[in-house]
């Protein structure tokens, strides 16, 4: 493995003022930044504050664990790709588990002595990445066990929340692999912490939507249709937010936001607003993060407020991790 640092500088990527075919790199950046922007929007909404503030100055905004878990998913994939690009076979799922253990350590938690203690990487040293608010309970409890959950041996077959769903976008951003492998990576990573199919299937559906937009270049209708074999996500009817219900809220937000001929940034804002309205109580950050990821994968950085392309803090770290993934997948 060559290094643990994102390749390239963290200066803002150029905006695209005129519509046209989007490059893969722009869709990756748009997806990851859009997810973080949606997360910040949902956090403000959940706190009873004006969520539009998330779209003006993102440098010091709070985010939930949706953003940090997504970035640690990227880092786990980047580490596996670093090994592979150096000619060394690596277990992608093990790399992701180690990344999530590092995320757990970042939350101030301490796995049991028998758990691996992976060394810090570049992401762990970034003080600008604030500890995510309200870390997913199922994720924390599974990682605190010190055991590596698998699809055949789940740690908790009852864990059906959205903790695996919210971190699954990066699997849809890896090019040059078949869709079946992207789905396998998503499901194996979801099973590290969530044992119920109600949690893992929506994660695969979401990464499939992201892949259809960012890799396959489908339009929104085609991307949503490409995951139709798993069935449309259903709205929440239980007291606790579910993965399927939260994905349903995000998709409804995106459909509402794109129902107009407005510019991409306005569609982005509308999608976030509708997603948090449709979400179950307490699920606003996750639903808005998912909607933001879809909109970013669809429109690239055209969807984002300009501040996200130049701001310090969390957006700068997201940009760096996006470029690290791009570097390892394309050599650019």
Name the predicted role of every residue range.
Residues 1-332:
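Structured, active/binding-site neighborhoods that engage oxygen-rich ligands
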